[in-house]
Amino acid sequence: MPKRLSGLQKEVLHLYRASIRTAHTKPKENQVNFVNYIHEEFGKYRNLPRKDFTTIEHLLRVGNKKIATFSHPELTNIH
């Protein structure tokens, strides 16, 4: 039986999926750049302790702001 996810884990997963969905709204030739950036950003904090709630909440706020920025149609590429 799979382990149930906590509220923060669900929020992180939602942020990741929303980020990938946003990346797929960009031009085909630049989507890989966005997806690579997302993987790098999430990978940086992969080993963050699950009990470090304040850091996780801060990173969620920062991530949501980045999604809002990346969702603008004027932004077509990221390096």
Swiss-Prot record:
Record note on what altering G63R does: Abolishes the ability to complement a yeast strain carrying a deletion for this gene
Single GO BP term: iron-sulfur cluster assembly
Keyword Hydrolase: no
Annotated compartments: Mitochondrion matrix
Keywords: Chaperone, Mitochondrion
Chain segments annotated as transmembrane: none
Deletion consequences: OXPHOS incompetent because of a profound and specific reduction of complex II activity.
GO CC aspect terms: mitochondrial matrix; mitochondrion
Matching InterPro entries: Complex1_LYR_dom, Complex1_LYR_SDHAF1_LYRM8
Broad class of the protein's primary localization: mitochondrion
Additional detail: Present with 861 molecules/cell in log phase SD medium.
Family per record: Belongs to the complex I LYR family. SDHAF1 subfamily.
Name of the protein this chain belongs to: Succinate dehydrogenase assembly factor 1, mitochondrial
Native source species: Saccharomyces cerevisiae (strain ATCC 204508 / S288c) (Baker's yeast)
Taxonomic lineage from the root: Eukaryota, Fungi, Dikarya, Ascomycota, Saccharomycotina
